[in-house]
Amino acid sequence: MHIGTRLGAAGLAAALLLPTGALAAGPDQAQARQEDLDTLYAALQEHHPDLYANTPQEAFEAKKAEIEGRLAEESDVDFALDLQSLVALIGDSHTTTNIGSVLNSTGLYPFGAEWYDGSWVLTGAEEEDAALLGQTVTALNGVPMDEICTRFGTLVSADNPVKLRRQTEQLLYSEACLDYLGIAESGEPLEVTTSGGSFTVEALPMEDFGDAALSSLSQQRESTPATAYRKGTYYFAQSLDDTTYYIQFNQCMEDPKQPMDGFAAQVEAELEAGDYRQVLLDLRNNGGGSDGVLVPILMLVPGLVEEGVKVYGLVGEATYSSAIINAVELVDAGGVLAGSPTSGSVNHFGSTGSFTLPNSGIRVSCSSKYIDLGTLLEAGLGAQVEPLVPTVRVEQTLDDYLAGRDTLVDWLLANGADYTAPEQPDAPLTRGRLAWMLWQAAGAPEAEPAPFSDLMPFAYYAPGVGWCDQTGVANGVPGGAFRASCAVTLEEAAQMLVRFVRQQGLTPAEVRSCLLYTSDA
């Protein structure tokens, strides 16, 4: 097998993005670098919504002074990594320097490791070391893997541990990064220690790396599951069996060959023609884009749930950015999340813009706002900058990977249709849920869509909010919003209940019955 799909330029580009120009050289090199450093810090101060949210200003200025002390002597590559290490202090996965092409000019070690069963597993090696594939990687040059992740935390842009681990995985074979972090020395071999023995590798120039022969663990797979990631495919749907319908959504982008409206119509027709008990929406390999693309599919979810169909959103460590928003939206629509914690954080900085440093040509992506999903979606209420953790926790195992099985999908095929999500008795009562409960108590009459700017039309509580608005049971707030995801105050709850009683013309006995109904709903 030739390196080039999992490793090489693609991995580095994914970790630190792309492209840059040539760095300045000559007697004015230090001055040019100083200008770039000053420009970077000033632009971050001006454009980032909360630069010092995770690291105090003093630490930024100390790091900047440290970098200034070596501007005249360090290499172009180390200067680029210095810039990224300054950006890493923000603790924002979306704000990063795009130095992938700088790293692509450096050496790459011909091996690979990925995360399975709670440890690092050797997934790529030169042919003479292929017998160690599948073994646990414990150290590089004697540095334990946990310590290596910690060191990468000073270099990469990551706002949660899952994102840090993925960034580490994508840069683990970069000679320049390992040298910068004191794990390896450029020009010297790297010792890889596994549970089955150790071996050494020499870094290869990028131009030779793509042609190097590498044995891969993927070559040992017995088969590939029907739900395997289809790289390059925006979305597709298929029946897995008579009871399970599967949708793979890989990019939050419209497929030019099949716009989402048409795809959603196809899905709806196929669901109506079948007798499915569960629908799986797979977001495990979706790295983001525009969260609005999925709305036509999300609009189908409340009706399915009402008919007794279980709807699962499948998430994993590659679920990121707008795909996180879609996953939380799915829960608000009545779905359940299954899989493993995500690299994308529920609340996060995002909506990026960019600027370019004047001398190096390095482009910097910078967040422009903080996205707090709890202000829009009930399922995001109380969340922090943290991975999205699914209700159903099922991790892909190495044994299943090698056997060609999808651990999560197999579990859902066996258990999903009959699974009942645990109750959340401590969850706060939101304005949206109370509106839904009162609408249900009224018999769930037909209601026009509510006009509120912050109300998602696919949310399970949307009809209730619409009915409450039309009947005067509940009103919006200034600015045309309803704040459905916010916890209802005692005053708001009392007002809504009093208005509901009047609207329904209830007797005292009926009021008591209604209160018992809503408390049990």
Show which residues each predicted segment covers.
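Bacterial N-terminal signal peptides that target proteins for export
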Residues: 1-8
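Bacterial N-terminal signal peptides
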Residues: 11-19
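Flexible, low-complexity junctional segments that flank or bridge functional domains
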Residues: 16, 24-278
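Short, low-complexity export/processing leader segments characterized by acidic and small residues
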Residues: 20-22, 517
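C-terminal "post-core" interaction segments
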Residues: 27-41, 196, 232-420
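Stable alpha-helical elements in mature extracytoplasmic
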Residues: 33-36, 56, 60-63, 79-86, ...
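Sec/Tat-exported extracytoplasmic proteins
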Residues: 41-55, 71-75, 87-90, 94, ...
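Feature responds to low-complexity, polar/acidic, surface-exposed segments characteristic
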Residues: 414, 418-464, 470-491, 497-519
